[in-house]
Amino acid sequence: MKKILITLTVLFAVIDIMAQEHLSFKGIPIEGSMTEFCQKLKSKGFTSIGRENNITLFTGRQATVGVTATDDGKNVFAVVVLFDPSGEWNTLVNTYDYYKDLYTRKYGKPTISKENNPAHLDSNTALMAEVHQGTVVYGSAWEVTGGDIQLSIEKSSGVYEGMVMIRYRDSQNIEAKIQNDLDDI
């Protein structure tokens, strides 16, 4: 009986520790205030390029990184990586496939993956027109310890341009934000 109680206690302690783990971006747990998280990004070599509505934009090597926090800025809950826009379908797909392969190697098969461009022609113009119209569905997601990671091809603000986007969402802090928002309505 004593062994069973000890085993159950250890099991619940391990589950509790796992449940409290935050998702990380570039080795930085997605937690804490906007200021704290951004300081950690700066120490990793990112450069701040602006802040608006609790979304801070940083620039890294080939991408812009957005950090999203609660309205009061006290709790970071998501990080979004936006790769440079492109008007070339092959560039978008090659970037998407490269990161999909990396994440699959690290986290295993995606929890969900759908890749469809409904263009009837295989020309760059036809493919990018579908991106521009928002009819392309190209995305994969991984449920990982502490949250989820989503990879997708999205329409960008330029005409016939798209971009690859990676979203990191910390499940604990997303849930805390939702609870705060529910309290406000």
Region roles according to the model:
Residues 41-78:
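N-terminal, post-signal-peptide region of Sec/Tat-exported proteins
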Residues 20-52, 84-185:
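Non-cytosolic coordination micro-motifs
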Residues 58, 65-67, 79, 149-153, ...:
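Hydrophobic beta-strand residues in large extracellular and virion-surface proteins
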Residues 4-15:
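Sec-dependent N-terminal signal peptides
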Residues 77-85:
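Short, compositionally biased strand/turn segments
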